[in-house]
Regions:
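N-terminal accessory regions of nucleic-acid-interacting proteins
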Residues: 3-14
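Short helix-loop capping/hinge motifs at secondary-structure junctions, enriched
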Residues: 1-5, 54-56
Length: 133
């Protein structure tokens, strides 16, 4: 799909899921490109499933690290809503079925360590829970 308007974007979205967008800050701070610092094998878990019938524009979103709330926001606070993001991205590249768009992260980003338990909760979706290795 190419050049989709925000009004038409919903027709091209299969569904929504949680993600943990992990970065290696040592690499990120020493290189000008983010690709390598976000590309290790376990760095972007998704899931645990895709919800196909949900309005993405006003959902609470939280991250817990070892049971402590670290991030707390709402999708209504996104700078650009999901439909606008799909439209914008489709003006620059062809999008194919199965492509995934991550919308960003709320404030509260911090260091993680091996053994930490991370839990993403987005209203209406199953929680995404992982242990850092």
């Amino acid at each position: 799909m190419r050049n989709v308007t925000p009004a038409a974007a919903a027709r091209y979205i299969f569904g929504y899921t949680a993600a943990q967008d992990i970065s290696d800050r040592t690499i990120q701070n020493s290189e000008s490109q983010f690709a390598r610092c976000k590309s290790f094998d376990t760095f972007t878990p998704l899931g645990p499933y895709v919800e196909t019938k949900i309005d993405p524009h006003d959902l609470s979103i939280q991250l817990f690290q070892n049971g402590q709330l670290r991030q707390n926001s709402n999708t209504s606070q996104l700078v650009f809503n999901c439909f606008h993001l799909v439209s914008f991205i489709s003006t620059n590249m062809t999008m194919l079925p199965g492509d995934v768009i991550l919308t960003g992260t709320p404030s509260g980003v911090g260091p993680i360590e091996s053994g930490d338990r991370l839990e993403v909760r987005i209203q209406g979706l199953a929680p995404l829970v992982n242990t850092v290795k």
